[in-house]
C-alpha cells in the first residue's frame, strides 16, 4: 500500500465519524466530488469496497472496519506526536474527543468552559447521544473520554467517578397529592419515564427492583426536556436528574420529598484501556477530578 497517505485516512475517518460524504466534505472544507474521489482512491488501494448502502445509509464493510481502526491508530499517533512536540516547546495543543450521554449535557459544559479558557489551543469535539449511541461509539473506539452515569460492565474500561448525580421525584407545580411519603404511595399516578437502556431508567429500575415496585401506569419519553415539560403541563410525575432542572424556572415543577430519594450515583469519566490517552484527554481528566 505504497500510495496510502495520511490524507486518505483522514478523509475516510471523517466520512465514518460524520456519517456521510456530504457532512465529511463540510467538516474538511472540501467539495463532495473531492471527498468521493479520495474514498474511491482508498478503496482502490485496499482492493475492496469500504462501504455498503443499507436503507439509504453508509455502513462500513469488514474491510472498512479494518481501515477505520488503522486510521484511528495512525492519525491518533500523529496527533499525540504533535502534542508531545508542542508540549516540549511549552505550547499545549491537541484534540479532545468527548462523547457524553444526553443527561450529561447539563453537566459537562460548565466544566468545559474553564477548561477551554485554560487550554485555548486544544480543539474539543463534543458529541451528545443516548446511552446506546455512546456505547456504540466506545466499542468502535471513536473518542478519548466518555461520560456516563451508568457505565457498561466491561473489564476493558477504566471508570473514574467525578461528580454526584442525584435523581429526584418531580410533580406538576399545582400537585396536591401525596408528599413526604415513600415511592409506593405515588404508584397510582402516571409516571413519565426515560426509555429502557438509558442510565436514568436503569437507576430507577434497580431501585424499584430492590423494593419490589412496578409502575402500573407509565409513559416512555426519550427526552429529559420533553419529560420535564410534560410534568409541568400536568401529564404525570417523573424521576429525573437534578441537573436537568438547573436552568428551569423554579416554579415549573415541584420536587417531592420521597423516602429514599434523591437516588445518588456518580457521573463517571470512562476510557478504553488499550487506547493511548492524548495529552489533551489527560488534561481534561485532571480537570474533572478537580470539580467540586
Annotate each PLM feature.
Residues 13-31:
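Short helix-boundary/capping micro-motifs
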Residues 43-60:
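A short LG(V/I)-centered, amphipathic sequence patch enriched
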Residues 43-46, 67-89:
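Alpha-helical linker/hinge and terminal dimerization helices associated
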Residues 89-90, 157-191, 195:
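Flexible hinge/capping segments at coil-to-helix
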Residues 93-154:
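Central regulatory/effector-binding core of bacterial HTH transcription factors
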Residues 107, 255-292:
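A late-sequence structural motif
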Residues 130-135, 139-142, 200, 205-256:
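Hydrophobic hinge/microswitch elements
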Residues 181, 189-211, 277-281, 285:
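Secondary-structure junction motif
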